[in-house]
């Protein structure tokens, strides 16, 4: 078998017909309902730090080895191609892939970028937020210990 020596710690469905598996050395994307077939098999030679996904994209975080940032987020489409690579230094709490947006945040910092990797915002929160989530358009829900705020990005 192709996966004889692979450990596959992560498996998820993007939609009814598309799923993916992340092994220690590869990303495999499957298509088809009843009998899924491998549509992409991407070999990876770096250790994956974490995995994020939505219905159309898969994000893999690696430690950056180029010195550009602490981390590198590679965002793959369902064909297994890297659509963008985003370098960042923030120790992230969560990464959200939503529509054409990438949101990387922790309690005190946030980075917003589009799927082309263009940063739209990179800054600090005045209030520590426990949760930061997109609502619609340029509006976001920010939940702190004291309040629930709506933030609008320009």
Predicted regions and their residues:
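Surface-exposed loop/turn elements that mediate protein-protein interactions on large endomembrane-trafficking
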Residues: 1-4, 23-45, 67-88, 108-126, ...
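Beta-strand C-termini and the immediately following turn/loop, strongest in propeller blades
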Residues: 14-26, 54-72, 103-109, 142-147
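Short, surface-exposed, charge-dense and proline/glycine-enriched linear segments
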Residues: 99, 116-121, 138-144
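Repeated scaffold domains used in trafficking and secretory/extracellular systems
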Residues: 2-16, 42-56, 87-100, 126-139
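Hydrophobic, glycine-enriched assembly/anchoring segments
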Residues: 131-154
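Residues in flexible loops and secondary-structure boundaries
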Residues: 19, 37-38, 61, 83, ...
């Amino acid at each position: 078998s192709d996966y004889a020596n692979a450990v596959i710690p992560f498996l998820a469905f993007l939609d009814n017909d598309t799923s993916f598996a992340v092994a220690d050395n590869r990303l495999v994307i499957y298509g088809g309902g009843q009998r899924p077939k491998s549509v992409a098999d991407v070999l990876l030679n770096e250790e994956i730090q974490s995995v994020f996904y939505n219905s159309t994209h898969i994000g893999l975080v690696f430690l950056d080895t180029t010195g550009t940032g602490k981390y590198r987020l590679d965002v793959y489409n369902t064909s297994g191609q890297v659509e963008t690579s985003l370098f960042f230094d923030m120790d992230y709490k969560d990464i959200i892939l939503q529509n054409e947006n990438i949101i990387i945040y922790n309690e005190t910092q946030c980075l917003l970028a589009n799927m082309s990797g263009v940063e739209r915002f990179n800054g600090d929160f005045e209030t520590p937020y426990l949760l930061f989530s997109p609502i619609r358009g340029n509006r976001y829900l920010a939940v702190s210990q004291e309040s629930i705020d709506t933030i609008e990005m320009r």
